[in-house]
Amino acid sequence: MTVLLWLLLPVGLVLATGLATSFYITRRQPRSAFHTPAEFGLEFEEVTFRATDGLALQGCWIPVNGSSMRGHVNGPKRAVIILHGHGGSLDWDIHRAPALHEAGFNVFLFDFRAHGRSQGRLATFGYLERYDVQGAVEFLKSRGIQSIGVLGFSYGAIAAMLSTPICPEVRAVVADGGPARMRTAITVRAVELHLPRWLAGPLTWLAVATTSARLGANLFQYEPVRWVGKIAPRPIFFIHGELDQYVPDFDDLYTAANDPKEAWRLAGVGHTKVSEIYPDEFRRRVISFFDCNL
């Protein structure tokens, strides 16, 4: 019996570590910034809407000028949904709204589940967040929007790539800093936290497997590299900094996508830093892409 216990102890420790890591990476993320479109002179409406699995989410609706806040939009029936990164909230990306709004787009931002002011206890790296994006699409349809684009950053880009195949209303996607495989990005983060690389990889795999068991789903089947090819024939525009440590497998992601696709790759730029280093060119390219496809 003593020998058996000693044999089982390492197994138990490994499983416990995997479970603890699973709870850590899926934990709720508090609101970490406080901004409103009013800071940029934009009229807006704070809204509560439902993900398609019923969870209540908090959003921010910025219609084109001259539109009723609570009714159908007047003017262009096109909108862009901006999707924030992991640990963030819609507050992070409100500064991106003015350029799109000025270009004639209605803009919608929201907090993902388990982030900011939205309900939910689990951040699932795209698996359940697909339903958040679906809910946002339904909200926009209720305001008369007919053509929708999605602009996602990092975690938000993952959600964009997983949700667009099940959202026929989405006509164009911009994915900035979206990993091909979330487990690769988590492994990199673990190494940054001083975990040995030889341990970080297996521990991440175990954490994803444990999270899969908690959700009753195989999250390995819900990696962007497996879904991005289903976006076509709608276009996708990738933005990638060559120094992005969280996306070392960008070539896999781009290869998996089907035409029409394009990529803007920049040397010497890190994770989701393109818009900071080249703000004017970023705005020009993104607006041009949506103008051509919405």
Question: Which residues fall in each region the model found?
Answer:
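Alpha/beta-hydrolase active-site loop
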Residues: 92, 123-143
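Catalytic histidine-centered segment of alpha/beta-hydrolase-like enzymes
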Residues: 269-280
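Conserved alpha/beta-hydrolase
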Residues: 97-119
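The serine-hydrolase catalytic nucleophile loop
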Residues: 86-99, 112, 249
